[in-house]
């Protein structure tokens, strides 16, 4: 990402979490209410919410009680959202409509698929790769996700492994007992899609490396690896994420770190990305802003959405990304949109938003009482940098504008700031 992202820190006010994160609760047996059915608008909003999911609304498959309270404030008596809301998650191993259905069941409020942004959703904008033969890595419905993003010629890691069984050698139980005949009929791979963390990391790491080092023909091999290598598009840079366990779990950012380290060690060169998506990339926030705008148009809200409030639990992805996008909006307002790197902009329509305000909650990754928190260490030292290699570390960008206990308090805070009734 371009170096301008490392400008001085925002003058952000820090909050203090006085209460521990509340215990997660199970599904509420209430029928889902439609969240943005078209209807008459009263006091058209000029702000919208970008809500993280894991650690903000849910922990694993259990809803956080504060999320139910928050949505009772966000939804009016007719079952309509009072303000535009988009759910922005770095999850990617699920279909968009499936995630919407999951949220509907958890929140008791019908969520449509076009309110949900998965980590790889902005790949729809990379149309120059949609006709190329792409190797896709991840788990779950990877083929359906890739095709839904516009990629029409996709091969999975498992399909590649079956075509070239001699490539996957770590698991002794899966090694062939006989040597297969070489294949010359397998079409060359032209790029790599990294949609999310795979299940068998050793297999995916090995085969992705084989594709990159062989210029897309892993059955043949090359004496000298090509550089630049084949295009790589990746989503979800989260090193860690929060589920039901007491400590954070490895995210796709950890897998990317492994791949980058192996490539560097083997070739002596840096793995390069044509696109990095998911929080904290600016591209993801631009995509979210566009969905907020379209949602407001469907509701008939004529006033432009000027403020975005991004609520998350991870200082490195949610807070960093919101603050980075805020800087982008400020710079775009004064100087025009800057040029960015792999996580940069592809936006066609000028941004109407003027600010993106970060709100950090204490129900997920962030916990000030945890010694492994991303808070600055004692003695004035800097916290560990959990962000991606291509993000220039600026500690100030991890400083949230507001820190509250949970998403319900975040909604109350925003409504007070905007002069809206809490109920």
UniProtKB/Swiss-Prot annotation:
This is Haloacid dehalogenase-like hydrolase domain-containing 5. Gene3D superfamilies: HAD superfamily/HAD-like. GO terms for biological process: glycerophospholipid biosynthetic process. Transmembrane segments: none annotated. Candidate gene for the Cat Eye Syndrome (CES), a developmental disorder associated with the duplication of a 2 Mb region of 22q11.2. Duplication usually takes in the form of a surpernumerary bisatellited isodicentric chromosome, resulting in four copies of the region (represents an inv dup(22)(q11)). CES is characterized clinically by the combination of coloboma of the iris and anal atresia with fistula, downslanting palpebral fissures, preauricular tags and/or pits, frequent occurrence of heart and renal malformations, and normal or near-normal mental development. It comes from Homo sapiens (Human). Pfam families: Hydrolase_6. Belongs to the HAD-like hydrolase superfamily. Widely expressed. The keyword Signal applies. One of its GO terms (cellular component) is mitochondrion. Keywords: Signal. Residues 1-23 form the signal peptide. NCBIfam families: CECR5, HAD-SF-IIA.
């Amino acid at each position: 990402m371009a170096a301008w992202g490392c400008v001085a820190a925002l003058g952000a006010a820090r909050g203090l979490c006085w209460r521990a994160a509340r215990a997660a609760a199970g599904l509420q047996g209430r029928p889902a209410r439609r969240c943005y059915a078209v209807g008459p608008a009263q006091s058209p909003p000029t702000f919208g919410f970008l809500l993280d999911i894991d650690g903000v609304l849910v922990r694993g498959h259990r809803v956080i009680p504060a999320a139910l309270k928050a949505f009772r404030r966000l939804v009016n008596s007719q079952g309509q959202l009072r303000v535009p809301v988009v759910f922005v998650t770095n999850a990617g191993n699920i279909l968009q409509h499936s995630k919407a259905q999951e949220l509907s069941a958890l929140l008791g409020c019908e969520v449509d698929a076009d309110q949900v942004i998965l980590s790889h959703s902005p790949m729809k904008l990379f149309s120059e790769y949609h006709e190329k033969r792409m190797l896709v890595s991840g788990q779950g419905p990877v083929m359906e996700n890739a095709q839904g993003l516009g990629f029409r010629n996709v091969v999975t890691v498992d399909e590649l492994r079956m075509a070239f069984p001699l490539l996957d050698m770590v698991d002794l139980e899966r090694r062939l007992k006989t040597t297969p005949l070489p294949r010359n009929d397998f079409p060359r791979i032209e790029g790599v899609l990294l949609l999310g963390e795979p299940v068998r990391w050793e297999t995916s790491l090995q085969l992705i490396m084989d594709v990159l080092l062989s210029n897309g023909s892993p059955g043949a091999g090359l004496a000298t690896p090509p550089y630049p290598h084949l295009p790589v598009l990746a989503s979800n840079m989260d090193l860690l994420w929060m589920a039901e366990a007491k400590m954070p779990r490895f995210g796709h950012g950890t897998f990317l770190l492994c791949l980058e380290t192996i490539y560097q060690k083997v070739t002596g060169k840096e793995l390069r990305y044509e696109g990095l998506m998911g929080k904290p990339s600016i591209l993801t926030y631009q995509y979210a802003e566009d969905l907020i705008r379209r949602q407001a148009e469907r509701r008939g809200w004529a006033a432009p959405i000027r403020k975005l409030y991004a609520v998350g639990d991870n200082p490195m992805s949610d807070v960093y990304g919101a603050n980075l996008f805020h800087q982008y909006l400020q710079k775009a307002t004064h100087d025009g949109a800057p040029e960015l790197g792999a996580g940069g902009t592809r936006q066609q329509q000028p941004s109407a938003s003027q600010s993106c305000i970060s709100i950090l909650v204490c129900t997920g990754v962030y916990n000030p009482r945890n010694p492994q928190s991303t808070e600055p260490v004692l003695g004035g030292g800097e916290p560990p940098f959990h962000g991606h290699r291509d993000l220039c570390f600026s500690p100030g960008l991890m400083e949230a504008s507001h820190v509250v206990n949970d998403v319900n308090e975040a909604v109350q805070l925003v409504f007070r700031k905007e002069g809206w009734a809490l109920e």
